[in-house]
Every structure is written in C-alpha cells, then in structure tokens.
UniProtKB/Swiss-Prot annotation:
Associates with actin filament appendages that are formed in the inclusion appendages of the parasitophorous vacuole during infection of the host erythrocyte. Residues 1-39 form the signal peptide. It comes from Anaplasma marginale (strain St. Maries). The keyword Coiled coil applies. GO terms for molecular function: actin filament binding. This is Appendage-associated protein. It is found in: Secreted. It comes from the Bacteria. Residues 232-262 form a coiled coil. The gene is aaaP. GO terms for cellular component: symbiont-containing vacuole. One of its GO terms (biological process) is biological process involved in interaction with host. Keywords: Coiled coil, Secreted, Signal.
Length: 419
C-alpha cells in the first residue's frame, strides 16, 4: 500500500498570537504524520519487495524534504512577525491595565446622557403642561357630555330615518301607477296565455260566421240582379248583332254595285276562255275565293291552281292566265280612272290608286320576262313558272288596307274567273 503526503501551507495571522498557535498546531500535525509514515514504511519494507520499498522510501524522502522546506519558511515568517507579536502582547497588557478606566468612562458617559435627556424631557413637559391640562379638561367635559352627545346622535339618526322615509314614500307615490301598470300587464299576459286557445277559436268562429253571412248577402244580391244582368247581356248581344248585320248589308250592297259595274264584255270573254281552257285540260282545277272580315275591313283573295297534268298542258294554262291578267290589268286601269273621274272612289287614298298602276306595270313586266325566258327555264310541276308573276301580283294586291280598291279588283276577278 502506497501513501502519498503533500505539503500544506500554514496560515499565519498578521496579528501575532493567533497565527503562532496555528503554526504550532501545524508543526505538531506534520510531526505526527512523519511518525506515521515512518511506521508504515517500516511495515512495507518488512512485507513488500525491495523495488517497492525503494519507491516508497524515495517518496518518503521527498515528503521529508518538503517538510524541511516548510519548516524553514515557517521560521522565516516567525522571525519576520516576531516584533509584531511582541507589540500585540504589549497592547494586550495595556488593554488589561486600562480596562477598569474604560468601563468607568463608559458609565460616566451614560450618566451624562441620561441627565441631559432628563433636562430636555423636563423642558418639553414644561412647554406642553398647559396643553396637557387643557386636554384633561376636555376629556372631563367629554365624559360629562357623553350622554348628551349620544342622545344627539340618536336624535340625528331618527331625523335622518324620518326624512329618508318621507323621500321613499314620495318615490313610491310617484312610481305607484307604473308599478301597478306593470303588475296589471303581467296579470293580463298570464290571462291571455291562459285564454289564448279560446280566443283563437272565437276569432275563427267569427270569421266563419262572417263568411257565411257574406256569402248569403252575395247570393241575395246575385238573385236580385240576375235578370238585370241577363237583360243587359242580351241587349249588348242584340246591339252587336244589329251592327254586324248592318255592316254586312252595307258591304253586300257595295259589292253588288261593284259587281254590276265590272261585269263587262271583256270580263265575260276572259271567264269563258278560262273555262274552256280548264275543260280542255284533264286533271286541272281552278278556284277563286273572296273573304271579308268585319273588324278591319280587309279582304283576302285566294287563287288556287292545281295542275296534275305536268307534261304538256301546264304551260298553256299558265300562259292563258297571264294573257288574261294582262288584258284585265289594262281594263282595271281604265276603270279606276273612270271611277276617279266620276267620284266613285272618293274614299280611296293615293297609295291605293298607285297600287293599281303598280299591279299593271308588274303584270306587264312579268309577262315580258316570261316571254324572253322561253323554254330555257325548267318550270316546276305545281303552280308553274307563272308562280313568280302570280305571287308578285297577289303580294301587291292582298296587303292593301283600303278595302274599296281591293273590292274593285276582287270584283273584277270574280267576274273573270268566278263561276
């Protein structure tokens, strides 16, 4: 077992004696440690190997050298601090010699302080003596008047409570209607909530009874005015029928007059030609319709041409119709001028008069175009190549709003093509 010891410095006090005591204790400890180390070293030498013993011996020698050096340092410190240690011993002796005098001086100072404090307190008491006496008198007065003061406080409390009670009563009187209204409102709300179903049923029953009574009154009124309403409707119906009959009669008279004027020899000849052409062609039908309405006075002319024999006879039929229209257009123009000169078409406006001349020019132009086209154009199977000419003619005639002019033309067509 190897034990290593290190050097430890000795703390030395600069005051003298405390440091010397610690140094002596340190030396004693070091001597005891050296003795123990030597004893341990002897046991190690006896029990251990020579090499181990030499190592431990070397370590012990180093420790002894360190102890010797420490001893030298401590001796130097002791030599340095020896005068101070001696001075400290002298000062302690002086302190021990003067300690009774120091105690006496401290007691003297305490006595002097108490005497001065007593003087100051006596001066303060002399200054405050009147105030203290006055305070004693006031305390005596307070003790004497304490029952009266208590009575006064109780009286003030009673007066305050009385005034507060008055104010509260005034506030209650002011707010009593509002409080009563609020209470009444709550009671009424509770009653309404309780009787809500009954009130709803009552309203429904009143509504049903009212509707029944109203229905009875309306039925009575209807029964009272029933015949009056029927009479008024019949009267209005008769008036409308009379106006319609009068209008139809007037229209019939005017149309008869127009038919009587326009049944000329040329119209009869054209009609006969068309009939002969129609009779010579099988499966061909012609129809001319004249329709008149009472509301706007417009008249509609419908020319129906149906040709089922499309091989040879169609062109001849269309050509005959176009020739007849060309001749009849000239007749219409002359008749229109004659009527204008005689005043027979005084209600005819200028656009309608221009319409007749436009029809004449359209028929003439269409005929020329058909003749120049010749056999180059392929004609359709129904309504033929004259469909364009006829469509142009009826498009110019039919939309006219002046029924007098249309009646002139329609009467002429009826005279030419009618049965």
């Amino acid at each position: 077992m190897i034990v290593t010891y290190g050097t430890v410095g000795c703390p030395v006090s600069r005051g003298g004696s405390p440091g010397c005591g610690r140094r002596i204790a340190e030396e004693l400890r070091l001597a005891e440690d050296a003795r123990l180390r030597l004893a341990l070293l002897g046991r190690c030498i006896v029990k251990g190997s020579p090499a181990q013993a030499r190592g431990e011996l070397r370590a012990e020698l180093k420790a002894i050298d360190a102890t010797i050096e420490l001893r030298k340092e401590l001796d130097a410190i002791d030599a340095e601090w020896a005068p101070k240690i001696e001075l400290s011993a002298e000062l302690r002796a002086i302190d021990a010699e003067w300690r009774p005098a120091i105690r006496l001086r401290s007691a003297y100072r305490a006595i002097i302080g108490r005497i001065e404090l007593r003087k100051e307190l006596d001066a303060i008491d002399a200054e405050w003596a009147p105030k203290i006496e006055l305070s004693a008198e006031l305390k005596a007065i307070d003790a004497e008047w304490r029952p009266a003061i208590r009575l006064r406080s109780a009286y003030r409390a009673i007066i305050g409570r009385w005034e507060l009670s008055k104010e509260l009563k005034a506030i209650d009187a002011e707010w009593r209607p509002a409080i009563a209204r609020e209470s009444l409102r709550k009671e009424l709300d509770a009653i309404d909530a309780e009787w809500q179903h009954a009130i709803t049923f009552w309203h429904i029953s009143r509504a049903i009874i009212g509707s029944i009574e109203l229905s009875k009154e309306l039925k009575a009124i209807d029964a009272k005015w029933k015949y009056v309403a029927i009479y008024e409707r019949q009267k209005a119906q008769r008036r409308r029928e009379e106006r319609a009959a009068k209008a139809r009669e007037e229209l019939r008279k005017e149309l008869n007059d127009i038919d009587a004027k326009w049944k000329s020899a040329s119209a009869i000849k054209l009609r006969k030609d068309l009939r002969s052409t129609s009779e010579g062609v099988d499966h061909t039908e012609f129809a001319l319709e004249l329709r008149a309405t009472d509301k706007s006075g417009n008249m509609e002319l419908v020319l129906k041409l149906k040709a089922t024999d499309t091989k040879n006879q169609h062109d001849a039929i269309v050509k005959a119709i176009e020739d007849g229209f060309v001749g009849y257009a000239a007749e219409c123009g002359a008749a229109t001028r004659e009527l204008n000169a005689c005043g027979g078409m005084s209600t005819t406006s200028a656009p309608s008069t221009d319409l007749i001349s436009t029809v004449v020019s359209a028929v003439t132009t269409g005929t020329g175009q058909q003749q120049s086209a010749g056999s180059e154009s392929q004609r359709p199977t129904e309504c033929g190549g004259g469909g364009t000419l006829l469509s142009s003619l009826f498009a110019l005639i039919l939309p006219s709003s002046n029924w007098y002019c249309n009646a002139v033309l329609y009467g002429g067509f009826l005279g030419c093509l009618g049965s």
